[in-house]
């Protein structure tokens, strides 16, 4: 699987966040609280959802499944106004990304093993310390094997 390389503009997101780890995965809880309220958000760029991970700087240097990171359930907006109660604004910085078109269940770790253990070490890129995110469009079906999503990995040239 070869990604496309894309320069992304800065994006304005509105959503909810929590801290979790791989072992203490609270993704379902996060999304179950967010999805019913998404109609409260105005000026959406598209109907897509953004699942974002904001990792500490040393997260990938010393991987530990108990290490905490910030997870977001969000949507992109054109302008930030009237943020619904209990939600927050997040500015996703501009930068270069490797974008993987993934088809499969959201719980299958093999795609991430491929990206970080096979593709990245043999590419001409290195991981950048910016948020990682997934774009969940109309073909996203969570744990359905026919589900489709885009996985955006922040990169820098060597």
For each predicted feature, which ranges?
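A solvent-exposed interaction/effector surface
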Residues: 1-158
């Amino acid at each position: 699987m070869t990604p496309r390389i894309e320069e992304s503009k800065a994006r304005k997101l509105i959503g909810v966040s929590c801290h979790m780890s791989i072992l203490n995965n609270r993704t379902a809880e996060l999304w179950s609280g967010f999805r019913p309220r998404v109609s409260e958000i105005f000026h959406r760029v598209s109907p897509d959802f953004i699942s974002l991970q904001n990792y500490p700087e040393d997260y990938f240097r010393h991987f530990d499944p108990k290490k905490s990171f910030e997870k977001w359930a969000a949507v992109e907006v054109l302008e930030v106004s009237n943020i619904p109660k209990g939600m927050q604004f997040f500015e996703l910085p501009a930068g270069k990304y490797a974008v993987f078109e993934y088809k499969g269940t959201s719980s299958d770790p093999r795609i991430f093993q491929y990206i970080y253990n096979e593709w990245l070490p043999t590419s001409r890129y290195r991981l950048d310390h910016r948020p990682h995110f997934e774009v969940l469009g109309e073909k996203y079906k969570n744990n359905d094997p026919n589900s489709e999503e885009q996985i955006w990995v922040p990169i820098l040239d060597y």
